[in-house]
């Protein structure tokens, strides 16, 4: 007789990947548990996507009202404590909905930090539990760069940066990636003087150059943010009145004094839970898996940000669902990431779907592109938008393979553009599809039409 396990599946981590896997596997009526050391929902619900969306919504609304010449009332003020309270209420609602879905599916919640004892056993809050199979969905955490002084000078993280209860005069954001740009947007909308530093030559270096240029122009010309590319922070110091940030630009060291420092220096996979005890191979960049998410231990799988590489909520949820479906059906369908969207919640928002132009240049792949600037459509005049564009990319036969949008509410176009790219829609088919003339999505139609002339 084989070994009897406490569960058929234990899933470590309740973020989008772990939750998707758990809810899909629950259809099998097997004994399933999910381990979470914090609130259910992972960083998506509790510290990243939802709290950021709630906070940025408020800050954009405040900035729109206070900066518009139409609204005459100058007595409007922003309450940081009330904003944090709103954010926490929003998170609680989402977390409770996640918890309710897992409970209704009969999934057991194990509260605590998991650590492997052996290949089939973990310890959770002093209890030992066994499973026939494991799914690792432990996500990622803040990566602290090699900056002298982080052990003695206080700083904010992406999690705490949007929970401040009073306004600093000057804030420095270290890191010009998506998270750093969203924090810069949040602060500047509320009247905080912001400096943002990026080691690369432009903001958002993993997007096409037009994206970084558009967001930089919005930051500097509309929000008054000081953008400092090609800068590396080397040390933090504290004096009686302020924090001192020592940074290097080319070969010159300079100092800037600020009230608040936010480290938005990227993330790294969470790997410190006894993977060696289970015989799981991993690197500093993430857990090693095959094309079906199987680790070196054949009964243990991994999905989501703990794999390293490109990450997003949509990608993690897709991986969790695909893995669980394969396990239920004893199939080996491999992931198809064609046309996956990623978004950045600045204003204008950034949406990228499928290939970027940089991706194709690196692959030495031939393509056609068309760009429509936001000023070319009526919506820009109606909604007073100055910076943005749509770029569509097709292969030689005019099938869409990539799209980049910088515009207010760009994320609303994710479904349309993802559908087009995943299902091989041509530029002609998209150009022939009616779009609302006075809305931002009209740029998509115009860009598709322009592709036909290439």
PLM features: residue spans?
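Beta1/beta-strand and adjacent pyrophosphate-binding region of the FAD-binding site
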Residues: 3-15, 167-177
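Glycine-rich dinucleotide-binding loop and its adjacent helix/turn
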Residues: 49, 138-193, 197, 226-227, ...
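FAD-site-proximal beta/loop scaffold in flavoenzymes
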Residues: 152-167, 255-329
């Amino acid at each position: 007789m084989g070994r009897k396990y406490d569960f058929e599946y234990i899933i470590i981590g309740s973020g989008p990947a772990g939750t998707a896997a758990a809810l899909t596997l629950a259809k099998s009526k097997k004994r399933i548990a999910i381990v979470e050391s914090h609130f259910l929902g992972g960083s998506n619900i509790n510290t990243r996507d939802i709290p950021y969306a709630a906070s940025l919504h408020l800050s954009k609304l405040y900035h729109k009202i206070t900066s518009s010449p139409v609204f005459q009332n100058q007595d409007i003020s922003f309450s940081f404590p009330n904003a944090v309270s709103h954010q926490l209420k929003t998170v609680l609602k989402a977390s409770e909905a996640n918890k309710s879905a897992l409970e209704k599916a009969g999934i057991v919640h194990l509260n605590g930090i998991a650590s492997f004892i052996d290949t089939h056993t973990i310890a959770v809050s002093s209890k030992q539990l066994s499973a026939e199979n494991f799914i690792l969905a432990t996500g990622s955490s803040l990566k602290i760069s090699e900056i002298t002084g982080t052990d003695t000078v206080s700083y904010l993280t992406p999690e705490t940066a949007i929970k401040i209860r009073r306004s600093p005069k000057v804030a420095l954001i270290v890191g010009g990636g998506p998270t750093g740009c969203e924090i810069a947007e949040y602060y500047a909308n509320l009247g905080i003087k912001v400096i943002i530093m990026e080691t690369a030559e432009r903001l958002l270096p993993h997007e096409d150059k037009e994206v970084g240029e558009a967001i930089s122009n919005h930051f500097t010309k509309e929000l008054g943010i000081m953008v400092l590319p090609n800068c590396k922070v080397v040390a933090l110091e504290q004096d009686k009145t302020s924090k001192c940030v020592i940074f290097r630009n080319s070969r010159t060291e300079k100092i800037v004094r600020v009230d608040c420092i936010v480290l938005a220096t990227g993330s790294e996979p969470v790997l410190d839970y006894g993977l060696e005890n289970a015989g799981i191979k991993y690197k500093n960049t993430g857990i090693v898996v095959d094309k079906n998410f199987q680790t070196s231990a054949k009964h243990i799988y991994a999905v989501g940000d703990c794999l390293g590489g490109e990450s997003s909520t949509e990608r993690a949820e897709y991986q969790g669902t695909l893995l669980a479906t394969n396990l239920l059906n004893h199939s080996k369908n491999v992931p198809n990431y064609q046309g996956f969207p990623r978004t950045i919640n600045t204003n204008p928002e950034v949406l990228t779907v499928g290939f970027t132009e940089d991706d194709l240049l690196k692959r030495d792949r031939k393509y056609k592109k068309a760009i429509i600037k936001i000023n070319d459509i009526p919506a820009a005049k109606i909604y007073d938008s100055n910076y943005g564009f749509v770029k569509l990319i097709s292969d030689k036969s005019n099938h869409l393979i990539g799209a980049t949008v910088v515009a207010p509410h760009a994320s609303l176009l994710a479904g349309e553009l993802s559908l087009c790219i995943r299902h091989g829609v041509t530029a002609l088919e998209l150009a022939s599809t009616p779009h609302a003339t006075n809305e931002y999505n009209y740029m998509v139609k115009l860009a598709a039409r322009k592709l036909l002339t290439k």
